[in-house]
């Protein structure tokens, strides 16, 4: 099981799929990496030679921001948005959707568990 950027890449999956276990590497980037390293996309990581593993590891380290470094970069970007007080920063701070989605209904993932608010009683409702 090759270890790349602190992640154990699974042996039993195709190389293209196995690399997606690394944070910041999706399927298109994984196939791009394997193409640069001249490793077959269908070859499983346990079948990679030591030199192929080294080439893949070197390409990821040199050309891409992944794992902890990427997480830090994303957090710093969000922190900057909060500090400058822009609309997106305020939405992050308030824990609401950032990209213009509706919030009257839906947005439960971002807002968290539903907070029940007591409704008006029958006698106090407007007539």
Swiss-Prot record:
It comes from the Bacteria. Residues 105-117 have a biased composition (Basic residues). GO terms for biological process: translation. Pfam families: Ribosomal_S13 (PF00416). Gene3D superfamilies: 1.10.8.50, 30s ribosomal protein s13, domain 2 (4.10.910.10). The keyword tRNA-binding applies. InterPro entries: Rbsml_uS13_C, Ribosomal_uS13, Ribosomal_uS13-like_H2TH, Ribosomal_uS13_bac-type, Ribosomal_uS13_CS. Residues 90-127 are annotated as: Disordered. Located at the top of the head of the 30S subunit, it contacts several helices of the 16S rRNA. In the 70S ribosome it contacts the 23S rRNA (bridge B1a) and protein L5 of the 50S subunit (bridge B1b), connecting the 2 subunits; these bridges are implicated in subunit movement. Contacts the tRNAs in the A and P-sites. This is Small ribosomal subunit protein uS13. It comes from Salinibacter ruber (strain DSM 13855 / M31).
